[in-house]
Amino acid sequence: MTRYVIGPDVAIRLAHDEAVIRGEHRLLAPALLRSQMLSLLYQAVRRGEMTRKDAERQLNYVRGLRIRLLGDRVLQNVAWKAAALLGWPDTFDAEYVALTQLHADALVTLDRHLAEAVKDLVTVAPIEALY
């Protein structure tokens, strides 16, 4: 069993593609994933990039995935340290890094800048690893 942390970018891509995750994989994310996804999809609808119906379909797809959502004190403390170490202005991305450090085998992100920034802290895997 391989445990992957996914962010909202990956969750939205999986929903868009209606991807089937291989059964031996486990998905994890910080609890903030839900709010970030909701916000990103809302913004896309406001910009006219998709319909509300499409956004709701993607939300429902992700809600149907078996993603373990975590957000405890230990995660927050490790996220704080990671954000400080990397000089980031906030801790949002650091929560994904911290969760990977604490509970996962790799972080899956579509963000090349994030992948480059964290490559010395966690293993980064391509989205194709999930299929």
Residue ranges and their predicted role:
Residues 36-41, 58-61, 78-82:
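A general alpha-helix detector
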Residues 17-18, 40, 120-121:
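Residue-level signal for well-ordered alpha-helical positions
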Residues 13-14, 36, 78, 116-117:
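Phosphate- and divalent-cation-binding pockets in alpha/beta enzyme and binding domains
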Residues 34, 99-131:
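Acidic, PIN/NYN-like endoribonuclease modules and their adjacent C-terminal/linker elements
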Residues 49-72:
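Short hydrophobic interaction/assembly module
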Residues 67-113:
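Active-site neighborhoods of divalent-metal-dependent phosphate/nucleic-acid chemistry enzymes
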Residues 1-34, 44, 48-57, 130-131:
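Short, well-structured N-terminal submotif of metal-dependent ribonuclease cores
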